Regions:
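Flavin (FAD/FMN)-binding glycine-rich loop and adjacent Rossmann-like elements that form
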Residues: 1-151
Length: 151
């Protein structure tokens, strides 16, 4: 594939159903505490409330923390710290393993994907880097598209 000549496969799962994957180092790292404290960010791109369920990697049992209210995911979690003009979505956004145990599910992957795609389109229109899109404009556009972003 052109442009991918230097890509190296570091690791892959031995079976389907892997819950924990790699996460980028983003402009902000979402933490378990952010989720349990129901933190709301000014640059929020989605609202979410899935429980934190950490499955034992050795098999049998899980740690479960109910999320009693919603939290938000900031746009900065989609923006890599050192790579310009790239956005990520889904399980690989910037966060701790504990936080990922909540945001790794499909509805959140869809919401972060919508935010990343919308931000990329806005960046083209604004003539700026993807990570420099005005977050208020991004939030307004996502809301017009039907995204739920609570303050």
């Amino acid at each position: 594939v052109p442009g991918c000549e230097n890509i190296e496969l570091i690791e892959m799962a031995s079976r389907l159903g892997v819950r924990e994957t790699r996460h980028i180092k983003g402009q902000y790292k979402l933490t378990t505490e952010d989720i349990l404290d129901r933190k709301h960010f000014e640059d929020a791109i989605c609202t979410f409330a899935y429980a934190i369920d950490i499955h034992n990697s050795e098999g049998g049992g899980a740690t479960f923390h109910q999320v009693n209210d919603y939290y938000t995911i900031p746009f900065r979690c989609l923006v890599p710290e050192k790579i310009e003009n790239l956005l990520v979505a889904g399980r690989c956004i910037s966060g701790t393993s504990g936080a990922a145990a909540s945001y790794r599910v499909i509805p959140c992957c869809i919401a972060t994907g919508q935010a990343a795609g919308t931000a990329a389109a806005l960046a083209l229109g604004e003539g700026c880097e993807a990570g420099d899109v005005p977050t208020e404009k991004l939030r307004e556009t996502l809301t017009r598209q039907g995204a739920v972003i609570k303050d």
